[in-house]
Amino acid sequence: MRLFHRLLMATPSTMGSKSSLSEALALLPPLQLYRRILRVHRRKLDPEMRILGDSYVKSEFRAHRNVENPLHIIGFLTEWQLYAQKLEGDAWVGEKLDKSKLDKMSDQQIGQLYELMQAIKNPEGEGKE
């Protein structure tokens, strides 16, 4: 995320994105957001889910470290910031994934989501019931 210096105080509205974020909400820099998510996991998740969540967050941030497309960076940071806010507010329990977000996902992302769902439902890696 080499371009994040220019994007530190950018909002989705200034980048042309039609997001539900208010214009006053600035995106956190990647490192601050990463640390915030790990802190929220420590406070809100039970130990098994925390391990799963932490490893997923670490791998996603690592995979997006060298992304140069500003719109991709904004989308990535926006979604992770919304995730952190939901986790902090307890509004996430039992919430379903928005269909419009699911429609925008690639086949690879849907596969990742399915694997994540299976890991959550079957945390000990047991075989099918």
UniProtKB/Swiss-Prot annotation:
Alphabetic keyword roster: Chaperone, Gluconeogenesis, Mitochondrion, Transit peptide
- Show the Pfam families listed in the entry: Complex1_LYR_2
One GO term of the cellular component aspect?
A: mitochondrial intermembrane space
| Alphabetical GO biological process terms | gluconeogenesis; mitochondrial respiratory chain complex II assembly; succinate metabolic process
Determine the domain of life of the protein's source.
Eukaryota
Point out the signal peptide segment. none
Q: Where in the cell is it found?
A: Mitochondrion matrix
InterPro entries registered for this protein in UniProt: SDHAF3/Sdh7
How is the subunit organization of this protein annotated in UniProt?
Answer: Interacts with the iron-sulfur protein subunit within the SDH catalytic dimer.
Q: Which family does it belong to?
A: Belongs to the complex I LYR family. SDHAF3 subfamily.
Report the protein's function: Plays an essential role in the assembly of succinate dehydrogenase (SDH), an enzyme complex (also referred to as respiratory complex II) that is a component of both the tricarboxylic acid (TCA) cycle and the mitochondrial electron transport chain, and which couples the oxidation of succinate to fumarate with the reduction of ubiquinone (coenzyme Q) to ubiquinol. Promotes maturation of the iron-sulfur protein subunit of the SDH catalytic dimer, protecting it from the deleterious effects of oxidants. May act together with SDHAF1.
Q: What name does UniProt use for this protein?
A: Succinate dehydrogenase assembly factor 3, mitochondrial
Query: What's the source species for this entry?
Result: Aspergillus fumigatus (strain ATCC MYA-4609 / CBS 101355 / FGSC A1100 / Af293)
